[in-house]
Amino acid sequence: MSQLLTARQAEELHKAMIAYLLSANLPKSAAALREELADSVQLDDSTAKKYEGLLEKKWTSVVRLQKKIMDLESRNNALQSELDSATPTSLARRNQDPVSWLPHAPARHILQSHREPVTCVGFHPVFSSLASGSDDTTIKIWDWELGELERTIKGHTKAVLDVDYGGPRGGTLLASCSSDLTIKLWDPSDGYKNIRTLPGHDHSVSAVRFIPSGAAGSPLSGNLLVSASRDKTLRIWDVTTGYCVKTLRGHVDWVRDVAASPDGRFLFSAGNDQVARLWDVSSGETKSTFLGHEHAVECVAFAPPTSYPHLSALAGLKKAPPSSSSAEYVATGSRDKSIRIWDARGTLIKTLIGHDNWVRALAFHPGGKYLLSVSDDKTLRCWDLTQECKCVRTVKDAHGHFISCIRWAPNIIKDAGVVNGDDTSTAASANGGALAASAINGVVPTGKKEDPGGGPMMGIRCVIATGSVDLKVRVFAS
């Protein structure tokens, strides 16, 4: 008898083996095993039925456990490597300072309810609400702090491709866009009632973003919304009237993504024509084109002013642009597996190589030091802009399938009630906003940024959300 098993365990194993041979239509082998074991195993037909399938279940359980052990060992090795390369001082600083915080496994919450791939996520600028959209045609609203589903919004008739919070001063709205050719506006303060539907695009609407307001040269209100479509156009909408006030033409193929600059003066878009474009919102004209990708460009992002010193050094400049300037640097991610960082004139500064599949979404760290990316290779990567854009962290298997989106929770702005047009002492900037742009001249150890002249203070929220083809939304938080 094996020294590894007790007599009872050995008997159970033998019964399972005989039952397996009988179920596999191998009666001679089963009889031979019975004879070999003599009277040590009593197994009648009813008992054999009970043990049928037990051996296969045990086997698959062992395989699953082995995989889990390997995953845990890999994660443990990664954490040990991080500890070995860190000093007590740097660890303390990293744990306390949101400016240096990066996401790591495991996720704080795994949100499950969608029945088809998750395509997009978006954070409410003030509350702990997170919206997710899916190919299942629904939008789901979650409490990201509790990890609970709050409600399911139905209205679109095809896949929901993007969501974004923002809107007029005094009232945050949720915008969504879909393959059904429409954009819908929902009112969070009224049970997410559908208050307006914006038709006009001739094909799927890929992306939607509210345009921030308040800076010189930008729109005077938060009433504007930009959308990108497979019909090759960008459209700017007035959400109070529902009218399209401007159509931007220049792309020659599907426009996949669009972003608005923190002060609302510029737009950045890209798509299947492999070209990114920087637009002036007021004139509707293209200011710069960005050429170099070898496949469709899936995602775009404006670099926050906090990153200007690092990106200027990367570009070889002795002096960084002032933090009050807009759209100085941008980033693009492509199906060619690369990420590219550019200046506003379209000059390539750096190409980031590391992903093994399409790059699907980008998010700059509000502290300005890092760029985060997600990909169809199922990883989340963190690139350090102060170290020649070296990949300093990879969250492997962040999801079980292609990762389609990533968003960083908007900064909390202290003593800036004007952002929402009310008297609240704490508000948030969903897109960076003009107040955000003016509040980043100084950084204090708490992770808050403040204007030395007495302007508003911004607190970084160390929370990001990702969505995937695996039907899940994951929330990573400090």
Curated annotation (Swiss-Prot):
Q: Which CDD domains match?
A: WD40
PROSITE patterns documented for this protein: LISH, WD_REPEATS_1, WD_REPEATS_2, WD_REPEATS_REGION
Q: Name one Pfam family in it.
A: WD40
- On whether Transport is a keyword of this UniProt record, the answer is yes
Coiled coil keyword on record:
yes
Q: Look up the record and give one Gene Ontology term from the biological process aspect.
A: cell division
| Summary of the function given for this chain in its UniProt record | Positively regulates the activity of the minus-end directed microtubule motor protein dynein. May enhance dynein-mediated microtubule sliding by targeting dynein to the microtubule plus end. Required for nuclear migration during vegetative growth as well as development. Required for retrograde early endosome (EE) transport from the hyphal tip. Required for localization of dynein to the mitotic spindle poles. Recruits additional proteins to the dynein complex at SPBs.
Its subunit composition reads: Self-associates. Interacts with NDL1 and dynein.
What note about domains is in the entry? Dimerization mediated by the LisH domain may be required to activate dynein.
Q: What is this protein called?
A: Nuclear distribution protein PAC1
Organism expressing this protein natively: Paracoccidioides brasiliensis (strain Pb18)
Q: What gene, per UniProt, encodes this protein?
A: PAC1
